[in-house]
From Swiss-Prot:
One of the record's GO cellular component terms: cytoplasm
Family: Belongs to the class I-like SAM-binding methyltransferase superfamily. RNA methyltransferase RlmE family.
Enzyme Commission number(s) from the entry: 2.1.1.166
Protein name (record): Ribosomal RNA large subunit methyltransferase E
Protein keywords: Cytoplasm, Methyltransferase, rRNA processing, S-adenosyl-L-methionine, Transferase
Pfam families xref list: FtsJ
Region (Disordered): 1-20
Protein species of origin: Desulfosudis oleivorans (strain DSM 6200 / JCM 39069 / Hxd3)
The gene coding this protein: rlmE
Catalytically driven reaction(s): uridine(2552) in 23S rRNA + S-adenosyl-L-methionine = 2'-O-methyluridine(2552) in 23S rRNA + S-adenosyl-L-homocysteine + H(+)
Length: 207
C-alpha cells in the first residue's frame, strides 16, 4: 500500500485561506478584528504600539483602522518585510532590552498598546504558560510606561498557573478589564486575551 503523502500534514484552515485572499500575512489578523468589533479599542487618529508584530497582520489592520491621522509602531525580534501603509513602521528590537526612555521620546504618549507576543513553545504546558506570563508581564510593564491615562491595553497570554495573577495585574492598573477568547483562536489553543480599558490616572506615563 502506498503511503498517503498528505497524511498528517496540516492544511490551511478557513482563516488562513481568507488571510491569503485578503492580502494579510497571517490568520492572526482576524483575532484582532474580533477584538476590535467587540470592544472597539482602536480609534481613528490613535497612536498605537504593536508588540510581537511579526509578520505584520496586526500592524496592517491597526494602521487601516487608525487611518492616516494615526500612527502604528511595531516591535519584534524578527524583521517585518510586509509592505505597510505609510502610517505604520516597525523596529527590530528585544522587548526585554529596549531603551524605553528613548522609545517614549520617539513615540510620545500612546493611546493603545497591543501585544500578540508568544514564546517559542516547548511542548510542556506548564513551561509554555510560564514563559507566556513573563512576556505578558513585560508587555504590561512597557504599556504602563508608554500609555497615556485613558489608554487601552490588549495582551495575549496562555492560560496556566499565573493567568489569574496577570488578570489581577491588569485589573489594578485599568478602570475595567475583560478576558476574551476570539472564536478565530484554534480550538486546541490555550491562548486568550486580557484587555485593559482606560489606564488609571494614577499610573503616569514615563513613571
Amino acid at each position: 500500500m502506498k503511503r498517503d503523502p498528505t497524511k498528517g500534514r496540516k492544511t490551511p484552515d478557513h482563516y488562513a485561506r481568507k488571510a491569503k485572499t485578503e492580502h494579510y500575512p497571517a490568520r492572526s489578523v482576524y483575532k484582532l478584528q474580533e477584538i476590535q468589533k467587540k470592544h472597539n479599542v482602536l480609534k481613528p487618529g490613535n497612536a498605537v504600539l504593536d508588540l510581537g508584530c511579526f509578520p505584520g497582520s496586526w500592524m496592517m489592520f491597526a494602521a487601516e483602522t487608525v487611518g492616516r491621522g494615526g500612527k502604528v509602531t511595531g516591535i519584534d525580534l524578527k524583521k517585518v518585510a510586509t509592505h505597510m501603509p505609510a502610517q505604520a513602521t516597525s523596529l527590530q528590537e528585544d522587548i526585554y532590552e529596549i531603551d524605553r526612555e528613548a522609545l517614549a521620546g520617539t513615540l510620545g504618549p500612546l493611546d493603545v498598546v497591543l501585544s500578540d507576543m508568544a514564546p517559542d513553545t516547548m511542548g510542556n504546558k506548564f513551561t509554555d504558560a510560564a514563559r507566556s506570563f513573563h512576556l505578558a508581564a513585560a508587555a504590561l510593564d512597557l504599556a504602563l510606561f508608554l500609555l497615556k491615562p485613558g489608554g487601552h491595553f490588549v495582551c495575549k497570554v496562555f492560560q496556566g498557573e499565573d493567568f489569574q495573577n496577570f488578570v489581577n495585574m491588569v485589573k489594578a492598573e485599568f478602570e475595567r478589564h475583560k478576558v476574551f477568547k476570539p472564536e478565530t483562536c484554534r480550538k486546541d489553543s490555550k491562548e486568550t486575551y486580557v484587555i485593559g480599558f482606560s489606564k488609571k490616572e494614577s499610573t503616569h506615563v514615563g513613571s
